[in-house]
Amino acid sequence: MYVALWPGNVYPLGSYWDGKGTNFALFSENATAVELCLFDRNDKETRIKLTEVNNFIWHGYLPGISPGQRYGFRVHGPWKPQEGHRFNANKLLIDPYAKAIDGLLRGNGAEIFGYSWKTEEAEKDLVFSELDDAHLVPKSVVIEQSFDWEGDELLRTPWHETIIYETHVKGFTKLHPNIPEELRGTYAGIAHPAAIEHLQKLGITALELMPVHHFIALPGYLTDKGLTNYWGYDSINYFAPFSGYSASGTLGQQVTEFKQMVKALHRAGIEVILDVVYNHTGEGNHLGPSLSLRGIDNTVYYRLIDDDKRLYMDFTGCGNSLYVGHPQVLKLIMDSLRYWVTEMHVDGFRFDLAAALARELFEVNSLSAFFDIIHQDPVLADVKLIAEPWDLGEGGYQVGQFPVLWSEWNGRYRDTVRDFWRGADETLGEFAYCFTGSPDLYSLNGRRPNASINFVTAHDGFTLNDLVSYEKKHNEANGENNCDGDEHNRSWNCGVEGETDDPEILDLRERLRRNFLATLMLSQGIPMLLGGDEMGRTQKGNNNTYCQDNELSWFDWNLNQDNEDLVNFTRELIYFRRQHPVFRRRKWFQGRPIHGKGVSDIVWFNPDGTEMTDEQWNIGYAKAIAVFLDGDQLACPSPKGERISDDSFLMFFNAHHETIEFNLPTVFGLDKCDWSLVIDTKEPRFIREEKIYTSNQAVPVVGRSLVLLRRLE
């Protein structure tokens, strides 16, 4: 067909429909020619050479091209893998700025690779492939970006009021009985009133979604075993929502559906945080396919080994690392982040393996260009930024090292709280730090307790139920002979591996689940709950379900009584936290009086009621401790400048196996007060019938349990 090509504009990158036609623009520094490829409904291809190039941006405007048009690029240039160049115009490439993508990667043959499969393994990536792959790869889509937000804005929930719920778009609703079957596992499924009602009743304020950037499942390795890339940590584009989660269509309808989901969640008071993977792409190492950035300009977008540019630096364990040091790569990331905030109304981001983004040359640098440009951006200054503060490279564990404006997944919190409740020695001091927001990690560079994203479980590892039911991972279903997944789970099965009908073991496991949830919700910092933990979700001991798109990963909404009780206990905990600012302070504890009174804002005690000494923190076998939190000593005023006060509380932690009698503290007159029992984790719910402890009474705390008392005035 005849297509009239106008010169068009350099910006914006990608495809942009102006109501009369569409502008196309692609950055490639080393290309010698670029072809725009249009596809009709029958997949017939029309190629149009982009003749205009300015500042390495190839561009053109096509009148009459409208939303729903599918397209891709073929990029010509040198095939010199030893020098890092892997141009091959036989490969149709996804537009890195495409706002929608139609279709999934199909087939498992040699066509999608830039090199030939006809040579020996050690040399095959050096030989140019003559095979065309347009019939196998997803197509970019022109979209109309207009949407009636009806006044919707970012919620800007204060950090100290935030409760995060991490979940998977498909897994959360795939089996929900009250959601129409055609909507389950989709953006529309999350927007359904039944899904939102569950989150609202829990008290969730922020939904953290596992990757929704369009990702690929490479054919072969997983698909040959009947598995797939379920988690989605192999992005192939950073603007398009994954089309596989759309109930309405894949020619731009998925964008509208995603926006409708965000709007529905915002109306319910729930923010949307995206798990984003800017550290690598799904193209893998030198033996991976050419689907987008590799074929567009490999030396620009990826970090290559200096003395052998055929190979890729890999700080992620996924075969490649984006070269964030190049201005165009930084621009790609920043344009993507701004797009999701301004066009999709997303409230924040969790950066997967964020340390990889801060590497300059080889070392992680908290003053890197990535942080500089993030901190200067007025759009991103208003959203939540969360780092997974590590990568797989040398020196990659950076917990506590990120700069201001950033919160971090606190991996030390997870490890310490797990160790404490399984009865490990020498954990008291670390546990106390973690319970108070980890000031030893986050207070030194000007950050506050909200820098610590506290979690006990996350998508990567055991669920809460499995944490107290398995001591070893059981990943046989992944097809890797149980060799994948972390061996160091800090878990305890309570005496039997896996399922059991022993009532004592079941009672202990239920108590431990409540201990973990109560510790999480009553700690300073920001709690993150793994979706499904509130209802006892199990993965049968699999701690790495990245490839399990089945009932092993999907939520089971048919709950027994124990799990119904756990849901209600979790609701009560979250409501309690939201009612009491003493558990979500905006400033650090001082360990001294703040408003001139004789009682410190926090005091730690032995079970006998005496104050902890420096020496006692180092008693390795001690596994029981008490803490007093003074609600009259809150350092931050209300938004109107008024002084805030709260109730005061005593908490008793007993990680020993036997019951311990705790005496009420004998200092500051605390033994002269009456105390009301609020939580005892040996019970399935919050205490309903009032139980009062007076000064001469000891408080029995059964083994492996937590008790919370409220001071009566």
What are these regions (language model features)?
Residues 1-165, 170, 500, 506-512, ...:
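Carbohydrate-interacting/catalytic domains
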Residues 47-48, 177-193, 470-475, 640, ...:
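Short, polar loop/linker segments at the starts of domains and inter-domain junctions
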Residues 133, 168-346, 353-379, 396, ...:
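Substrate-binding/active-site clefts of carbohydrate-active enzymes
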